[in-house]
């Protein structure tokens, strides 16, 4: 029998709108994902990054306002940065939860 495949899509604000909210949300999400993994499912995760990309874009543009040697960051760069840090938070939360449960796969 083949494993059950589960796709999890974390929507627009599922991971919060601030860094502390995201930290808490990724830990809570990791628990649910670990439950699925323990049950034998193959899990694929997709996530939105709208609040996070907005925070990064604002921060980068504010930083560059009074500095002639810095240009404003394009939205595509900010999006890549936010995808990386959201993925990093999810990865760390899921890894920690699985290790806590003794799941090593």
Say what each PLM segment does.
Residues 1-51, 55-65, 74:
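N-terminal glycine-/serine-/threonine-rich phosphate-binding loop
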């Amino acid at each position: 029998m083949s494993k059950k495949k589960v796709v999890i899509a974390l929507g627009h604000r599922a991971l919060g709108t601030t860094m502390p909210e995201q930290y808490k949300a990724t830990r809570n999400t990791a628990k649910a994902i670990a439950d699925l993994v323990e049950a034998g499912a193959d899990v694929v995760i997709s996530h939105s990054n709208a609040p996070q990309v907005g925070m990064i874009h604002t921060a980068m543009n504010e930083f560059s306002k009074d500095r002639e040697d810095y240009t404003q960051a394009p939205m595509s760069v900010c999006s890549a940065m936010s995808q990386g840090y959201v993925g990093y938070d999810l990865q760390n939360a899921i890894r920690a939860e699985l290790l806590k449960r003794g799941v090593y796969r």
